[in-house]
Amino acid sequence: MANIKFIAVSRSLSGILDYVTNREKTVERLISGVNCMAQTAQDEFEAVKKQFRKTDGRSYYHIVQAFAPDDPLDFDTAHEIGLKFAEYFKGYQCVVVTHMNTAHIHNHIIMNSVNFENGQKFHQSAREMQQAKEYSDQLCREYGLSFTESKADPFRIPAWKKRLCRTIKEAMENCATREEFIA
């Protein structure tokens, strides 16, 4: 079964699309769109955001679906699984790209943060992440694939984030007014 990771957004939408579609990592037939055309995804994502006035905040989600190196899997089948997995996110536009340049086959799924049907922004709660992983596992079972253990708990809060929350909470408790806290 595939290991699913929601990757922290660190690039612009154009930057991540350039990265995942890099021809040193994939080929044209392994680049597809779900509810959009892969070649015009950036414009389509932005049009949906403008239509629903949701141009601020996170613009996309980056999901990696990695398969075990010893799975009896070819690139086209991995891509097919990636497309089916992307369809799980109903109403969201996704670009699905299968990378061929590492020991393990993996899909990159770039998903618009705004639903094109109702304008709702996607929020990746721990529950939603777990449900997505379970759906991916179900797809892998259907294709007779093995299980890939996650190297890290996807729901673990990083230590730096816990420290930051504690520091902010302490600062809030030591301030009498909002202005004092901001200063």
Q: What does each model-identified segment do?
A:
Residues 1-183:
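N-terminal nicking endonuclease/strand-transfer module with a His-rich metal-binding environment
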